Structure formats: structure tokens, C-alpha cells
Amino acid sequence: MSFRKRGEILNDRGSGLRGPLLRGPPRTSSTPLRTGNRRAPGNVPLSDTTARLKKLNIADESKTKMGLDSSHVGVRPSPATSQPTTSTGSADLDSILGHMGLPLGNSVLVEEQSTTEFHSILGKLFAAQGIVHNRISDSSADKTRNGDTHVIVLSLNQMFAKELPGIYKGSRKQMKKNLISEEESKVTVQNLNETQRSTPSRYKDLKIAWKYKLADEKRLGSPDRDDIQQNSEYKDYNHQFDITTRLMPAPIASELTFIAPTQPVSTILSQIEQTIKRNDKKLIRIVIPSLLHPAMYPPKMFESSEIIGLMHGVRSLVKKYYERVVLFASISIDIITPPLLVLLRNMFDSVINLEPFNQEMTEFLERVYKSQPGKIQHGLVHILKLPVFTDRGEMRVLKSEWAFKNGRKKFEIEQWGIPVDDAEGSAASEQSHSHSHSDEISHNIPAKKTKISLDY
């Protein structure tokens, strides 16, 4: 340990003692300040400012970045990730996907485990929703847009366009009410003095009858504020379709493009990309109904090298034009091998599996809902992959949580619950009751004397 003197300067190569500081006038530097090409504020030319702003590229990002108009009726932000999302045509399918639709640049595969074709209904709904979006924008005031949605169908079935479902207009009673309300809304000489019909007389005569009005509103049901706000902001985002009607008029070539899957893979991919480029600034919805159907695909397409090459190319196009392309495909998994199915699932961002009920389960549901046939469900819905969430590593796999039913008017997906058969329960209770009653009788009646003879 070393000690230094109090006046010694540390790390000084000069003298050891530190003298007092000398104060004097400030020194003037011999080198002038480097001012450069400074200008007074306000003397910058306007041309230089405009040139700098152009380099910043602060234009309308909704058109340059997304490739779509910000006012597109078929696009809304995802409530989970805020990504631009479009509807699949089924509100229930939009809900279980987790984004209220399918995010742009993503794909969904709907697979079915039997020979039924419930998946074809979802494919038609997906295509019909795109046609409706295109016609809504085409009927706007801006006639130069010529629509903002285009549908590409990879299929040989030319009747697919004529089989698209129409928009649900309500029941017969609701349609009659709508016609009556439209007639009453028209201003004519007859209904000028009939405006009092809109308010029932009991609300005018009895002041205390306001509570009956509230009771009627509760009975009829009123939507929540959030639902009202969402519906008012995105009123044309999703539509309810009637699968018993047809979309009229049928889609034309400017709205829907057919591509034959019997062509070579390179030709199919080039035609898809040309269609995407030709319909610039439009939302492209690619539909592949009944993938690998033997009636539409050649035998060589069932080889893994061919079909995986096709789906890999389509997936690359979806990711290349991610700002305005979505993909929907459906397949029956009974006609392909399990290894090929695994490879196909890896090509899609989301996978939904439909498992129709067998005959025994169908008969059980028909017996349980004998008085309510509208509640009969037709199968289970399994969620194997979800868009965006699965890519993030979130294992959102749900099996036997949802069920689907193909109703008279629409395709529905709802939560699954095993129903209780009241007939079996009542029969079991009656049997147990009769058994207990016979036991009571046997206990009350004295036992008869029995005589047993033993012969040796």
C-alpha cells in the first residue's frame, strides 16, 4: 500500500506539485467555427422540400402496401391480430378460425372422413361470398372500379358457378313483412295521414303501458352494442346464404375464372399467376373444390411428387401476393393415403376436419330430437390447425368440441353436447321402480313352507 502527498497530481508526467489555477480572460480560438452551408430558417426552397417528401414515400399505404382499397367491403381487421381478414361465407366457420374470417395470405383446408360431401357446401359459400362482394363494389358510384373481387376455381365442373347459393332473404313471413314495410315507407296520398300506425294505440292511450313495450323488446331480443357497432361498420362483410336457392344472375367470366386441373402443373400455376396479375388491385379468392377427386384429376396427379408440387406452387403464389390472395380447398381423405394426407396438411395454414356421424349415432339423434328435427346434427368438427396461431407455435387443437348440421336453409357449426335420451331414462326408471316394488311385495308376503324329501 502506497501513500501519496496531498498536492501530488495523479498520473502526471510533469511536475509533481499542483499549483493554483490561474484565472484570466477567455482564450480566443484561432480556428473559426465550421458553419458549412447553413441557411436561415425559412430560406429553404419549396422544390427541395417536395423532393425530400417524395423520397420518404408517405403515400396512401392502404393502396400501395396492401394492394387493396381501404374501403373494400370484404376486408376487415382481425380482432385477434389486427391483420386484414376476409370472410369465408360462413359466419360459424369465421368464428372458429379465431379471426372472424381468413387472414389475407393464408389458406384453409376442409377435409372430410367419409364419402359424403358436406365440404362442398363450404366451398360454394366461399365462392359465393366473393361474387357478392364484387357486385356490391361494382354497383357503387365509382363505375371505373369494375368490382374489386375475383374468384379462381380449379375444377372441371363448369356447373359450379351455377350452383352457388343465393343470399338468404328470410322466411316467408319475414319476406311478407319486408314487402309491407317497403310499401308503407313509400310516400303516397293514402299513407300521408296514416303515420300513426307505426305506434300502437296502447302506447298512446295508457301512459303506464310503457312496461309492456319493454317486455316485448326483451321477448323479441335486442342485439348488444358491440354487435350493432360491428354490423354498422362492416355490414357487407359477411352474408347469410340460402343453400336451397341459387345466386342470380350466375357469375360471368369477369367475376370467376375456371382452370382445368388436368393440365400440367407448370401450366396451372402460370394461369393462376396470370389471372392474379390481370386482376390487379382486386381481392383474389382461390377455390379448389374436391381436391384429388378421381373424376376430375388424372391418375398421375395422385403421385406425391405431382400433387405436392401443385400445392406447393399454389401456396407460394398465395404467399407472394399475400396482401390480396386467400385459398380454400376441400378434400375427402378416404381416397388418399395417410402419408400423403400429412404432406397436404403441411401445405395449408389451417386445417378443419369434418367427421360425419355413423348410422347408429344418426338414429340416436333422430330418436332424441323426434319432436325437434331442426336440432339434429350431422357430424363433428375437429380443429387441427388455425391460421397465424399455429405458425406462432400455439397448439390450438380442438377435437369433438364442435358439431355441424346441414339445415334446410344454411350450414351451421355449433358447440357439441351429447344429448340425453329421455325414453331410455324413463324405461330404466320404470324398470327399477317395478323391481323395487316386487321386492317390497316379496318382503311383505310370508314365505311358504317347503317340504324337501331326501331319498337315499
Curated annotation (Swiss-Prot):
PTM annotation (Omega-N-methylarginine): residues: R13
Q: Where is the composition biased (Low complexity)?
A: 18-27, 77-90
Q: Where in the sequence is Phosphoserine found?
A: S222
Where does this one sit in the cell?
Cytoplasm; Nucleus
Concerning InterPro entries, the annotation shows:
Elongator_complex_protein_4, P-loop_NTPase
What would you give as a GO molecular function for this chain, any one?
identical protein binding
Q: Does the keyword Lipid biosynthesis apply?
A: no
- Which Gene3D superfamilies does the entry mention? P-loop containing nucleotide triphosphate hydrolases
Is the keyword Signal assigned to this protein? no
- Give the UniProt entry's GO cellular component terms: cytoplasm; elongator holoenzyme complex; nucleoplasm; transcription elongation factor complex
Q: Which UniProt keywords apply?
A: Cytoplasm, Methylation, Nucleus, Phosphoprotein, tRNA processing
Query: What are the Basic and acidic residues biased-composition ranges?
Result: 1-11, 57-66, 432-442
Which residue ranges does the record annotate as region Disordered? 1-91, 424-444
Q: Which GO terms describe its biological process?
A: regulation of transcription by RNA polymerase II; regulation of translation; tRNA wobble uridine modification
Q: In which pathway does it act?
A: tRNA modification; 5-methoxycarbonylmethyl-2-thiouridine-tRNA biosynthesis
Main subcellular localization, coarse class?
cytoplasm
Additional remarks:
Present with 358 molecules/cell in log phase SD medium.
Q: What does this protein do?
A: Component of the elongator complex, a multiprotein complex which is required for multiple tRNA modifications, including mcm5U (5-methoxycarbonylmethyl uridine), mcm5s2U (5-methoxycarbonylmethyl-2-thiouridine), and ncm5U (5-carbamoylmethyl uridine). The elongator complex catalyzes formation of carboxymethyluridine in the wobble base at position 34 in tRNAs. It functions as a gamma-toxin target (TOT); disruption of the complex confers resistance to Kluyveromyces lactis toxin zymocin (pGKL1 killer toxin). May also be involved in sensitivity to Pichia inositovora toxin.
Under the subunit heading, UniProt states:
Component of the elongator complex which consists of ELP1/IKI3, ELP2, ELP3, ELP4, ELP5/IKI1 and ELP6. The elongator complex is composed of two copies of the Elp123 subcomplex (composed of ELP1/IKI3, ELP2 and ELP3) and two copies of the Elp456 subcomplex (composed of ELP4, ELP5/IKI1 and ELP6). The Elp123 subcomplex forms a two-lobed scaffold, which binds the Elp456 subcomplex asymmetrically. In each lobe, ELP2 is tightly sandwiched between ELP1/IKI3 and ELP3. The Elp123 subcomplex binds tRNA through ELP1/IKI3 and ELP3 and can bind 2 tRNAs simultaneously.
Q: Which family does it belong to?
A: Belongs to the ELP4 family.
- Name by which UniProt lists this protein: Elongator complex protein 4
Q: What is the lineage of its organism?
A: Eukaryota, Fungi, Dikarya, Ascomycota, Saccharomycotina
